[in-house]
């Protein structure tokens, strides 16, 4: 996995609103740890099908989701992407928040995507 690959993951997959493209970057036994949920890690989605469902729910919750100002770093089998998440929720509330993903790679694919973002009060 390279910084160019991570850029394509965000521009073609997330900003293209294309779950199929996103999943081409994920390993078959991938894990997505979302920002919110009952577990210490948020909510842990395990396996290709569960991760696909979780990604699709993000597009449903924020139909105009867009990641901007992304910067990507890769060192061996680990990587980080910093970004600004922007989107309008189905209730009309606009969200813009700075965040990052911490990645673990395996075989040139994303094995773990652990997401974090700031907790804005306004």
For the regions a protein language model found, what residue spans apply to each?
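Short, surface-exposed coil-to-beta transition loops
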Residues: 66-68, 95-101
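A short hydrophobic beta-strand element
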Residues: 76-85
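Short, cysteine-centered beta-strand-loop-beta hairpins and adjacent loop/turn segments enriched
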Residues: 86-96
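Short beta-strand segments enriched in hydrophobic/aromatic residues
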Residues: 26, 85-87, 117
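A solvent-exposed, acidic/Ser-Thr-rich amphipathic alpha-helical stretch
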Residues: 4, 19-71, 76
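Short beta-strand edge/turn micro-motifs at domain boundaries
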Residues: 98-121
